[in-house]
Amino acid sequence: MLTLASKLKREEGVRAGRTPAGSNDAAHRVSIRDRLLIKEVAELEANLPSTCKVTFPDENKLCHFQLAISPDEGYYLGGKFQFEIEVPEAYNMVPPKVKCLTRIWHPNIAETGEICLSLLREHSIDGTGWAPTRTLKDVVWGLNSLFTDLLNFDDPLNIDAAEHHLRDKEDFRNKVQDFIKNYAR
């Protein structure tokens, strides 16, 4: 993280002294994103839920990281669920792209890894979608809440999981535990 901050300061100095007047907008957007990420990653690390762990495969690339969530209550207790988070160049005007890497039986997470969480949507009917005022902390806390208070059986992405819960809660719990045993340890 400190390496990236130093690199940004160096690049800013080079740009100020030697960049011609029509500088590349994409490079400027990346720079804005990276500046935001330096601040947001520090805030995230200071306010990370106890059930979450963030890792950066490349500490110089804050735009790509992994999140591990180990719920401490509910159906998913005992599991460790991995998510990949990619922050696009147009951040914070668009939300990060998130995928669940762990196979899971969950009404709001498809077995293919897609996630139904309103704050990850660019546009949402209920007004709770992405806004430039949201941060990585909101994303991580939202993902963490999918295992507790945001677990939503009424508006599912995985309809089979939601219907399974409606039909037989105990069998649903057993299937969740089978998935944890087989994929989430």
From Swiss-Prot:
Which residues are named in the active-site annotation?
A: C116 (glycyl thioester intermediate)
- CDD domains, from UniProt? UBCc_UBE2F_UBE2M
Q: Which SUPFAM superfamilies match?
A: UBC-like
**Location of the region described as Interaction with uba3 in the Swiss-Prot/TrEMBL record:** 1-29
Residue ranges annotated as coiled coil are none
Q: Which Pfam families match?
A: UQ_con
Stretch forming the signal peptide: none
One annotated Gene Ontology cellular component of this protein: nucleus
Q: What does this protein do?
A: Accepts the ubiquitin-like protein NEDD8 from the UBA3-NAE1 E1 complex and catalyzes its covalent attachment to other proteins. Together with the E3 ubiquitin ligase rnf7/rbx2, specifically neddylates cullin-5 (cul5). Does not neddylate cul1, cul2, cul3, cul4a or cul4b.
| Descriptive protein name | NEDD8-conjugating enzyme UBE2F
Source species, please?
A: Danio rerio
Q: Which gene encodes it?
A: ube2f
